[in-house]
């Protein structure tokens, strides 16, 4: 269990670093958020396996479903944003059109 929790902690720290160090590219931000959800899933699996309860493993499937929907919606918004503004730089797309 310790190895899985360590893996989850390392993945979470990498994703947190990706969010804080790269605030310009929306694609990297989406990937970091997905990696953060993956690290939480690894921890759910580790605790579910240790306690012998399948509820944590079942909960992972729901999280993966929500994460897939989030990624699809995020990429659709990103494509629309690129078509209208010709950039995906966060600093340039933070204003609303009036």
Swiss-Prot record:
A GO CC term assigned to this protein in UniProt: plasma membrane
GO biological process: ATP synthesis coupled electron transport
Location (main, coarse): membrane
Reaction(s) catalysed (UniProt annotation): a quinone + NADH + 5 H(+)(in) = a quinol + NAD(+) + 4 H(+)(out)
Keywords for this protein: Cell inner membrane, Cell membrane, Membrane, NAD, Quinone, Translocase, Transmembrane, Transmembrane helix, Transport, Ubiquinone
Residues passing through the membrane, by range: 1-21, 27-47, 59-79
Pfam families according to UniProt: Oxidored_q2
Compartments in which it is found: Cell inner membrane
Membrane topology term: Multi-pass membrane protein
Gene3D superfamilies: 1.10.287.3510
Enzyme Commission number(s) of this protein: 7.1.1.-
Annotated InterPro entries: NADH_UbQ_OxRdtase_chain4L/K, NUOK/Mnh_C1-like
Enzyme class: translocase
Described function: NDH-1 shuttles electrons from NADH, via FMN and iron-sulfur (Fe-S) centers, to quinones in the respiratory chain. The immediate electron acceptor for the enzyme in this species is believed to be ubiquinone. Couples the redox reaction to proton translocation (for every two electrons transferred, four hydrogen ions are translocated across the cytoplasmic membrane), and thus conserves the redox energy in a proton gradient.
Protein known as: NADH-quinone oxidoreductase subunit K
Provenance organism: Xanthomonas oryzae pv. oryzae (strain PXO99A)
Organism placement in taxonomy: Bacteria, Pseudomonadati, Pseudomonadota, Gammaproteobacteria, Lysobacterales
